[in-house]
Amino acid sequence: KDVWVVVFLALVSWVLLKLPAIWGQINEELFYQRGLAIIVFNGIILFTMWQNRDFNKKNILTYGLPLAFVALFISLLPKSGGDSIVLALIHTPLFLWCLFGLAYMGFDYKNMHKRMAFIRFNGELLIMTGLILIAGAMLTGITIGLFSAISMDIEHFYVEYIATLIGMAAPLVSLYLIGLNPTLTRKIAPVIARTF
């Protein structure tokens, strides 16, 4: 069941990411500057809540209201401005990361053990997501190379659609794999540490 939730959230995130291409009136640069973090973290937070089965009214409001406020605030910022807009854009993913932490802890922010577990989990998530993205980049290179060998140029299509879908799915797949096998990244991390 979790696999289908991952697929659904990845597809929804990907469709939201492609909104400027679907609806030509959206300024692509502004959209990605202001909306990318919201799209990515929204999928991650929703899947975390799904894993924890935390969809009660209080938790939905605790997650939904701040997210809606941030999305509205960011969208209403002037198109061009000074350092205050840059700072707002920098702090948006940090704020969303805090919301992700709340969701991971089951909204029990007073529990110190859960706080420490979340800090540790971030490292595991980064490692797993990084490995998936590296594998995706290798797959992209191999696929484009194979099609080039038969004189078919699919680079634009692949990067525009498939690669972006892989990018949206990577953190969600990482969450799923870590939930499925929590010791997986703990075995990988020492190998990476010894390698570098």
Predicted regions and their residues:
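N-terminal signal-anchor module of multipass membrane proteins
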Residues: 1-46
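Hydrophobic core of alpha-helical transmembrane segments in multi-pass integral membrane proteins
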Residues: 7-20, 61-76, 169-174
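Membrane-interface helix-loop-helix junctions at boundaries between adjacent transmembrane segments
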Residues: 25-34, 44-166, 180-194
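Extracytosolic (periplasmic/ER-lumenal) interhelical loops and adjacent juxtamembrane/interface segments
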Residues: 140-141, 172-176
